[in-house]
């Protein structure tokens, strides 16, 4: 008498969540500035002098004036023009001090090239496409705040201004680090392509029919 086999319990349904994606439409792979031991992001603005802070603020504001061209950001360009006039003495002094600093490290033409190379890095830093919108909004706020900063106060305020323009980029880098951590965890659990293998459990193994070997039948000679 043939015994009845219980139907095997189907394997559990595994719902795979969407694979994490980069923030703000960023590339799947990109390098972001590392963090120092104290958690400070080591960007091009990390550990710089007051004169370099002033000049990096100028560079960042210049990028905003050129790139934030939507109608709602019109005050940025007007604010930048005012900035160049009102704080011209601080800017001139900072530029001369920066030149002198590079000349202590390089000689002749090499000092000019070194400064231009560094400054290109600064411009590129503030031109990161995924951060455009939040950067322009920060530049709007800085433009309004500059109206209250006296020329005699600008050198000290430049640290505040640069930090505000840099903040959207630091937030993006933090978000990108989180994306990479989330992606690594997702791939560890679901595989690089989201394909997983569900192995049968003990109940399913026991419920499988046992295949009996068939006896061989002698063939007629």
Outline where the language-model segments fall.
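Bacterial Sec signal peptide processing site at the extreme N-terminus
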Residues: 1-15
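Post-signal-peptide N-terminal segment of Sec-exported extracytoplasmic proteins
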Residues: 15-46, 52
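Short, solvent-exposed segments of well-ordered alpha helices
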Residues: 41-55, 78, 82-85
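Alpha-helical bundle segments that constitute or directly flank the non-heme di-iron/ferroxidase center
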Residues: 47-70
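Mid-length scaffold segments of soluble, non-membrane domains
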Residues: 68-132
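A charged, amphipathic interaction segment
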Residues: 108-200
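Short, low-complexity, Pro/Ser/Thr/Gly-rich segments in the mature regions of secreted, periplasmic
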Residues: 197-221
């Amino acid at each position: 008498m043939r015994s009845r086999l219980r139907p095997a319990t189907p394997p559990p349904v595994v719902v795979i969540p969407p694979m994490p994606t980069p923030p703000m439409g960023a590339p799947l792979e990109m390098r972001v500035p590392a963090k120092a031991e104290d958690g400070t992001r080591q960007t091009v603005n990390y550990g710089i002098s007051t004169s370099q802070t002033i000049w990096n603020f100028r560079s960042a504001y210049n990028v905003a004036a050129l790139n934030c061209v939507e109608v709602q950001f019109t005050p940025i360009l007007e604010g930048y023009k005012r900035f160049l006039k009102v704080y011209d003495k601080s800017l001139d002094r900072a530029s001369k001090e920066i030149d002198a600093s590079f000349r202590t490290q390089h000689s002749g033409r090499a000092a000019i090239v070194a400064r231009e190379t560094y400054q290109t890095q600064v411009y590129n830093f503030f031109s990161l496409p995924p951060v455009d919108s939040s950067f322009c909004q920060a530049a709007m706020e800085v433009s309004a705040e500059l109206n209250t900063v006296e020329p005699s106060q600008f050198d000290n305020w430049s640290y505040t201004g640069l930090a505000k323009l840099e903040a959207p980029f630091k937030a993006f880098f933090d978000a990108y680090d989180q994306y990479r951590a989330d992606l690594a965890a997702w791939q560890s659990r679901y595989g690089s392509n989201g394909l997983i293998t569900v192995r049968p459990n003990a109940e399913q193994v026991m419920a499988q029919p046992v295949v009996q070997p068939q006896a061989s039948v002698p063939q007629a000679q």
